[in-house]
Amino acid sequence: MLLAHLPELGSTRLIKSRNPAEALQKLNETLTENVRRLVVIGGDGSLHLAANHVLKNGYTKQVALGLIPAGTGSDYARILRLSGDPLQALHQICTAVPRKVDVLRITDGNGEVRYAINTFSTGVSGWVSRRLAGLAVKGSAVYLRTTLKAFISFEAVDCRVVVDNTPWFEGPLYLLAITKGSHFGQGMHISPRASLDNGLCEVVAVEPMSRWRLPLRLGRLYLGNHLSASYVHYRQGRTVVIEPITNNPGFEIDGESTDAASVTVETVPAALTMLA
């Protein structure tokens, strides 16, 4: 049904892919100087892939990105207040006034650069992403089971965090999230004060917690009323440097697992044009 309505976008070419490598190959073949809009039908991972291609290949002044949520994780769609109904989301894209949004530029110790449209995090979220990356079958139920297992068995990681050239936190962490959007992890309201276009990133650190306190504190994280809690550290900034102290905890970028010894995260203002 959705395919029948795609001509509402104007002259349209549909790209289908079975994996990220094929998607990138087809984007290379398809994106030309004549393309003005790139609409992703998928989740946060698919949008992450498309946004990185646009950012790394110099299409940011030419191409506006749209999203029709259809993937396992759709936190960015929630942030943009896009409808979960594909036809409604398509209508929103067709009638939207393009808006500029910030992104996060992530540089690892080897100088490799990637971009996050929403979130870069470590701790329990990195643990979850590592395990999901190795699973052949994915979906909301698998994500929920993996997350619950993580909250029960995960051990805190030691990190040193510097924000805007000032030491901010050092010690054990359960979760460290650096975000542009308000939600991640399939609905966790981790950064309730976030803005997509203020030139700042949100930095939220959650200290380790006992198992018996976990349900209540986890509930606060999902509801978004945790920033004043004693076990949470919060601030805004433009540049964040993360240095694991004891071991490599594993990181995630927009839900995609990655490894690095140390990481620098920088806010890039007005980097992308979104249709929402």
Question: Which residues fall in each region the model found?
Answer:
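ATP/NTP phosphate-donor binding region
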Residues: 1-41, 48, 52-53, 57, ...
